[in-house]
Regions:
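A conserved glycine-rich beta-strand in the N-terminal activation segment of trypsin-fold
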Residues: 5-14, 30-60, 81-84, 119, ...
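C-terminal cap/linker of serine protease catalytic domains
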Residues: 11, 15, 185, 189-246
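Active-site-proximal beta-strands of protease catalytic cores
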Residues: 23-27, 58-63, 126-139, 170-171, ...
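PDZ/PDZ-like groove recognition
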Residues: 40, 45, 220-272
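Short, small/polar residue-rich loop motifs at catalytic or cofactor-binding pockets
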Residues: 43-45, 69, 174-178, 260
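Active-site substrate-binding loop(s) of clan PA
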Residues: 50, 86-88, 106-142, 173-174, ...
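Catalytic-histidine neighborhood of serine endopeptidases
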Residues: 55-97, 101-104
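Active-site region of chymotrypsin-like
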Residues: 103-119, 147-207, 247-255
Length: 272
């Protein structure tokens, strides 16, 4: 009945308030001078999620694009508290970055009572289709927006340089400029929202990189480590391709990026 319906959404609202303690707004501030020597300031925003605390810094996973050319990075926490941040490391393949806020600029009571470090769950679970999720950050293209829904598919992958990423598709109608994270109902991040990875006829449906495929990258960025780069895109050779076409098992190279180490080493499209 209607009372049960209200109770469900009341419980969801309470859950969202708890999860939002780990969600922040990231603002990249850039300055320039126009033709008349007037200083112009531009701001680009995204959402971020607090992923770790290393004893000196609070680490935040966010989109790389707003901070790429930024002269200053400002993080707005829950309750409107702001602090400056620095770029720890970026991953241009996924368009993600880790930024750091120094702990000594934040009040101890605030750190203890008002923010939460997000728990990274697993996206490689059986029967993930149908799993209820909450999208937080900016799923509607606006910071602070949210959406409720389910995972509808995890069958597609996004090929990137030297790796592939599992894509979680949802039934949440969002923005083509969506960002943020997907939480399951156990308080765990299971996906990082990305735009441009949905099927052509589902452009406004929120989708996300599965968190399991990103964990190694997140760890390296959190430690300020660079990524090894070959410049290859490929797919696994299927049993059908092996039996019907005689293609040996392995990684079938679908693309070699121009001037990449792989290209300079003589690796070509079609190699296995």
């Amino acid at each position: 009945d209607l009372d049960n319906y209200k109770q469900i959404y009341s419980a969801l609202a309470q859950y969202v308030a708890e999860m939002n303690r780990s969600i922040v707004t990231v603002t990249g501030v850039s300055s320039g001078v126009d033709w008349f020597n007037n200083v112009n300031e531009s701001k680009n925003q995204s959402s971020g999620v607090i992923i770790a605390q290393n004893g000196k810094q609070l680490l935040i996973l966010t989109d790389y694009s707003p901070v790429k050319q930024a002269d200053d990075i400002i993080v707005t926490f829950n309750k409107g508290i702001q602090a400056h941040a620095s770029l720890k490391e970026k991953d241009e393949t996924t368009g993600l970055a880790v930024i750091a806020v120094e702990l000594d600029v934040l009040n101890e009571d605030f750190l203890k009572n008002d923010i939460t470090i997000a728990t990274l769950g697993s996206s490689n679970i059986r029967d993930i289709a149908g799993l209820p999720v909450v999208a937080l950050g900016r799923p509607m293209g606006i910071n602070g927006s949210l959406g409720y829904g389910i995972i509808t598919s995890s069958a597609s992958e996004s090929a990137a340089s030297d790796t592939t990423y599992r894509i979680l598709q949802t039934n949440i109608v969002g923005s083509q400029n969506a960002g943020g994270v997907l939480f399951n109902l156990q308080g765990q991040v299971i996906g990082i929202i990305t735009n441009g990875k949905s099927a052509t006829d589902m452009k406004n449906m929120v989708c996300a990189y599965g968190i399991t495929d990103l964990k190694r990258h997140i760890e390296k960025m959190s430690n300020g480590e660079k990524f090894a780069y070959l410049g290859l895109k490929g797919v696994d050779v299927t049993e059908e391709a092996n039996s019907e076409l005689g293609v040996p098992y392995g990684a079938y190279i679908t693309e070699v990026e121009m001037d990449s180490p792989a290209m300079l080493a003589g690796i070509q499209q079609g190699d296995v």
